[in-house]
Amino acid sequence: MNIRPLHDRVIVKRKEVESKSAGGIVLTGSAAGKSTRGEVLAVGHGRILENGEVKPLDVKVGDIVIFNDGYGVKAEKIDNEEVLIMSESDILAIVEA
């Protein structure tokens, strides 16, 4: 995939949601829901501050993140693969192993 986000934008590939309930029941369709976890595929250079400095992003390529799947998140199909384009501020947490 050849894409470079600008400024504080991040490209994320949504992780598949767990398809079984805690009781072992297989969930399908909308019952499984959409995951709000994903892997960071690309990051912009950083957020431009009021004084003109560029603040590097906290997330990096390969991070697994939890994100807010709301208004500011844009889904795009690139190379037949759906990715999400979001601002770093849409990312709520980095999952650490």
From Swiss-Prot:
GO terms for cellular component: cytoplasm. Gene3D superfamilies: GroES chaperonin. PROSITE patterns: CHAPERONINS_CPN10. It is found in: Cytoplasm. One of its GO terms (molecular function) is protein folding chaperone. One of its GO terms (biological process) is chaperone cofactor-dependent protein refolding. Signal peptide: none annotated. Keywords: Chaperone, Cytoplasm. Belongs to the GroES chaperonin family. Together with the chaperonin GroEL, plays an essential role in assisting protein folding. The GroEL-GroES system forms a nano-cage that allows encapsulation of the non-native substrate proteins and provides a physical environment optimized to promote and accelerate protein folding. GroES binds to the apical surface of the GroEL ring, thereby capping the opening of the GroEL channel. Heptamer of 7 subunits arranged in a ring. Interacts with the chaperonin GroEL. This is Co-chaperonin GroES.
